[in-house]
């Protein structure tokens, strides 16, 4: 974890903050929950009042991203950053190459694993299993098995999701050229474009707003948040974060169940008392 030699160095860095990126599951929201805590809501609203932009950076597709009453995010980075919007403007759009989509589906079939694919507007699957069902249940959604699955394969696919254990991860990308794993759960994976990721998307959002890396901070907990935390001036790991995330973080706050974001922002004078 990065350390600061004195309080003035930390204070100067915090005073630069103009934009903050938040993961959802395990960061803004406790796993399996649908609503943020009152303190988290208070923190987000206070940041907006103080002129700091707030953004979601999540592995979730757009249609599964929850809206929180009274909170308006300035930008949303969905599909682990493969599709980003700032207000009504598309800032980044990076689908998985068609040949890789088809190869991954072929690999999954050989592994006897159903897959779910996400376009900008829809999520459809060619089947379901316990791991995929439980994965979707974390976001309080159901797997949508569609007879029109093959039609959606021909559209822009921004993310592929499937149940997949650690051993199976070695094989799911065989034969692909421009796809990579973005995993944050041990029983399933997200697959995104190789040039995608939350970190790449954050760079594009910062360019859109004409902010520097040093003017941004981010909060995350999963391994798919690592590049995000390294793409900002100060990446903060949640207390409940994976050890790999804590190792690269500039700082660590309390866990999501203990209102870690609220108390951290309060301690850094980024939100009002």
Where are these regions (language model features)?
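Short, structured coil segments at secondary-structure junctions
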Residues: 71-72, 80, 175-178, 231-232, ...
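Active-site phosphate-binding/coordination module
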Residues: 31, 38-131
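Short, hinge-like loop/turn segments at secondary-structure boundaries
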Residues: 71-75, 94-95, 131-136, 200, ...
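Conserved acidic, metal-coordinating active-site core of Asp-based
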Residues: 107, 111-231, 240
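Mg2+-dependent phosphoryl-transfer enzymes with acidic/Ser/Thr/Gly-rich catalytic loops
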Residues: 10, 14-19, 191-273
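Non-catalytic pre-domain segments flanking phosphatase-related domains
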Residues: 1-22, 49
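Short hydrophobic/aromatic-enriched beta-strand-loop microsegments
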Residues: 73-81, 94, 137, 181-184, ...
């Amino acid at each position: 974890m990065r350390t600061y030699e004195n309080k003035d160095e930390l204070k100067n860095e915090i005073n630069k903050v103009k934009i903050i990126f938040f993961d959802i599951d395990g960061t803004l929201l406790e796993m399996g929950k649908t609503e943020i805590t009152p303190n988290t809501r208070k923190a987000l609203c206070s940041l907006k009042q103080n002129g700091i932009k707030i953004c979601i950076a999540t592995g979730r597709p757009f249609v599964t991203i929850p809206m929180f009453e009274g909170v308006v995010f300035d930008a949303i980075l969905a599909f682990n950053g493969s599709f980003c919007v700032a207000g009504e403007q598309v800032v980044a759009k990076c689908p998985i190459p068609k040949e890789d989509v088809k190869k991954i589906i072929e690999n999954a079939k050989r592994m006897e694993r159903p897959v779910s694919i996400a376009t900008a507007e829809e999520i459809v699957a060619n089947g379901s299993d316990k791991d995929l069902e439980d994965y979707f249940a974390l976001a309080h959604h159901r797997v949508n098995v569609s007879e029109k699955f093959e039609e959606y394969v021909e559209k822009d696919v921004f993310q592929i999701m499937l149940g997949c254990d650690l051993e199976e991860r070695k094989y799911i990308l065989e034969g692909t050229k421009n796809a990579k794993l973005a995993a944050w759960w041990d029983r399933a994976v997200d697959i995104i474009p190789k040039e995608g990721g939350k970190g790449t998307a954050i760079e594009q959002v910062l360019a859109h707003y004409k902010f520097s890396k040093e003017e941004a901070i981010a909060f995350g907990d999963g391994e798919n948040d690592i590049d995000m935390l390294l793409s900002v001036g100060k990446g903060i790991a949640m207390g409940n974060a994976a050890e790999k995330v804590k190792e690269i973080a500039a700082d660590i706050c309390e866990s999501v169940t203990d209102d870690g974001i609220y108390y951290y922002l309060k301690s850094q004078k980024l939100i009002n008392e």
